Design a protein with these regions (language model features):
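Negatively charged, low-complexity tracts enriched in Asp/Glu with abundant Ser/Thr
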Residues: 1-24
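Sequence-level detector for tyrosine residue identity
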Residues: 16, 21, 28, 48-50, ...
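Generic alpha-helix signal with a bias toward terminal, lower-confidence helices
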Residues: 19, 26-30, 59-62
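Acidic, low-complexity, intrinsically disordered interaction modules
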Residues: 25-51
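Mixed-charge, Lys/Arg-enriched low-complexity segments
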Residues: 42-75
Length: 75
């Protein structure tokens, strides 16, 4: 299932789009979890991207924090 939304971390507002499943997907989920795809954008630029594998690492601490929040909710 897909989920979209926005999250504020510090002075940054991230738009996210995440594809997640009810059960973990060991082969291509983040850390073997339920998220198979996740994109974080800030000011129209990609700050993190995972598409069945890591494509773009978190660009800074705010991005890492946003990722941790979404991992807790969806993974």
């Amino acid at each position: 299932m897909w989920a979209e939304g926005s999250i504020k971390v510090g002075d940054s507002i991230f738009h996210y789009c995440v594809k997640h499943y009810e059960e973990p997907i060991e082969d291509y989920g983040i850390d073997g979890g339920r998220i198979s795809k996740l994109m974080l954008k800030r000011n129209g630029e990609i700050a993190y991207n995972y598409d069945r594998g890591l494509d773009i690492k978190p660009v800074d601490k705010d991005t890492e924090t946003a990722l941790a929040i979404l991992m807790k909710e969806y993974n």
